A protein has these predicted regions:
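Short mixed-charge
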Residues: 22-41
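N-terminal Rossmann NAD(P)H-binding glycine-rich loop of SDR-like oxidoreductase domains
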Residues: 1-26
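NAD(P)-dependent short-chain dehydrogenase/reductase
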Residues: 162-217
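Active-site Tyr-X1-5-Lys
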Residues: 132-134, 147-173
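SDR active-site strand-loop-helix element
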Residues: 6, 42, 79-83, 121-127, ...
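NAD(P)H-binding glycine-rich loop region in Rossmannoid oxidoreductase-like domains
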Residues: 59-100
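Conserved Rossmann-fold NAD(P)-dependent oxidoreductase catalytic core, especially the SDR/UDP-sugar
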Residues: 103-147
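Glycine-rich NAD(P)-binding loop of the Rossmann-fold in SDR/ketoreductase-type enzymes
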Residues: 63, 92, 96-107, 144, ...
């Protein structure tokens, strides 16, 4: 099976790539395991060199259809769509957030539709699609009420993927990820970046500012 990871040079993309290579197989459309033959990592920058002949990298703009057409062919059995502009940056730069989080996602789905081979598309959405007061247990059908541009873009992309799946163009799956903590390196532009900083920075002997009150509740997932 040929597998594509968008955002393949990012924190989660690199970890996912490493895990897929270790595993060496994925479940195919018939429910049986298929050997991982090729792993394509697409991002705007080059990632780590895995030293594995199965890995290839495409450096380019995911919003460019020509780049996606290079990355996706009829042998691409699974796509992990991780590429995104994070929450704080999407709020600060509306056009960039729309271009990458929404327009590029639709272009990816359109390339899949044009290929006509119905690949599995796993889309990493976010709990930012929710908002306001939530029930104690959040269900799959809990109403979406995004309160940021990032959350709205993720919610719209979810609906697009569901409709492309309903029409039989792709086999779509959505994962609504919470805040991932602790991320290594310097803080990114995510609104929840402090959730890593309040742990990471003190461990490095550095000061960290927590911009939210102690009563704040967060969903967290360890990498």
């Amino acid at each position: 099976m040929k597998v594509l990871i968008t955002g393949g040079a990012g924190f989660l993309g690199q970890r996912l790539a490493r895990k897929l290579l270790e595993r060496g197989e994925l479940t195919g459309p018939d429910g049986r395991p298929e050997k991982l033959d090729e792993l394509v990592l697409l991002d705007v920058v080059a990632g780590s060199d895995f030293g594995d002949a199965r890995v290839s990298a495409i450096v380019g703009d995911i919003a460019d259809r020509a780049v996606l057409e290079r990355a996706i062919d009829t042998q691409t059995g699974a796509i992990f769509h991780l590429a995104a502009i994070v929450s704080g940056q999407a709020e600060a730069d509306f056009d960039l957030g729309m271009r990458i989080n929404l327009d590029a996602s639709r272009t990816l789905l359109e390339v899949c539709r044009a290929r006509g081979h119905r690949p599995r598309v796993v889309f990493t959405s976010s709990v930012a699609v929710y908002g306001g007061t939530l029930p104690d247990i959040v269900q799959d059908d809990t109403a979406l009420n995004p309160q940021s541009s990032y959350g709205a873009q993720k919610a719209i992309a979810e609906l697009l993927l569901c409709d492309y799946a309903r029409r039989g163009f792709v086999d779509g799956r959505v994962l609504r990820l919470p805040t991932i903590s602790v991320r290594p390196g310097r803080p990114n532009a995510a609104a929840s970046s402090f959730a890593s900083g309040i742990i990471r920075e003190p461990l490095n002997g550095e000061e960290s500012v927590c911009p939210v009150p102690g009563s704040t509740r967060l969903w967290l997932l360890s990498p």
